[in-house]
Each structure stands twice: as C-alpha cells, then as structure tokens.
Design a protein with these regions (language model features):
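A short coil-to-beta-strand element that immediately follows conserved catalytic motifs
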Residues: 61-70
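Residue-level preference for beta-strand/loop junctions
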Residues: 6, 32, 64, 78-80
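Charged phosphate-binding loop/patch that engages nucleotide di/tri-phosphates or the phosphate backbone
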Residues: 120-138
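Active-site-adjacent beta-strand/loop module that shapes the phosphate/pyrophosphate-binding cleft
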Residues: 72-93, 103, 125-126
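Conserved N-terminal beta-strand and adjoining loop/helix that marks the start
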Residues: 1-21
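A structural signal for short, well-ordered beta-strand segments
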Residues: 10-12, 51, 68, 84-86
Length: 138
C-alpha cells in the first residue's frame, strides 16, 4: 500500500492589545499577496516550532498565549494547515525579500484582496477568543 504524501504548514492568527490582527503581504503569494503569517514545517519540526520560526525569520516577532485554533486540509495541493491563535504587541517589519509589508488591521479594515477563507477564519477566531484581553477578544 502506498502512503499519501502531503505538506504541512503552520500559520498564526495574531492579535495585538487593540484587537487588530497581523497580516503579511508576500511578494510571491497569489492574488493580492495578503495573508495570515506562516510557512512550511521543516523535517522533524513540530507545528508550533515552525510557526514561531517563520515569525522570527520573516518579521522578527515573538508571540505569547499560543493555542491551537484549527486545522484544515486541501486536496490541491495536498496540504494540511495547522493554525494557531496568539498574541503579540510589537512593531513589525519585513526581514526577508519574500515579505513586502506587515500590518495590523481591525476586522472592518481587512484588505479587500485577503482570501475569503482566511477572512472567515479571522472572524471565527474573534468569536472564539480567549487569552489576549483586547477589545473584541474577551
């Protein structure tokens, strides 16, 4: 029997003390480029480790109050995505060529080009909020 192969990614829905969510504009991402921060797991890496590594590498950000929020799978490409919900309250700036911009957005201000599925996940995350203590999250 042949085992199915797939990639695994880890992403972060990050809120600050004002209840704004952090999005990155990637140069190589389809559409508008805006999306939830994250990336692929490296061999032997746990999902939370990958999420933290990606945030450090791409924008120099450390997060706290980390909790698994949801996971989802895709058929094309074969991929499993694990999303964490966490908090941070820091200025962010791109540290790699692949990230064009990093900005905090309130939900009504989310960029028009943000994929609909990511917009829905952010809205759901606010509804199921817990740890950060900002408006719209507790």
């Amino acid at each position: 029997m042949t085992q199915v192969r797939f990639t695994v990614t880890a992403g972060a829905i990050i809120f600050n003390n004002e209840g704004k969510v952090l999005l990155l504009k990637h140069r190589f991402r389809a559409g508008s480029g805006w999306g939830i921060p994250g990336g692929f797991l490296e061999v032997g890496e746990q999902p939370e480790e990958a999420m933290r590594r990606e945030l450090r590498e791409e924008i120099g950000l450390e997060v706290d109050h980390v909790e698994i929020f949801t996971s989802r799978s895709f058929k094309k490409p074969r991929q499993v995505e694990i999303l964490f919900r966490c908090c941070a309250d820091a200025e962010v700036k791109p540290l790699t060529i692949e990230v064009e911009r990093a900005e905090w957005f309130s939900v009504p201000e989310l960029p028009a080009g943000l994929p609909k599925d990511q917009r829905a996940i952010i809205e759901c995350s606010i509804e199921r909020a817990s740890a950060c203590g900002a408006k719209g999250r507790d």
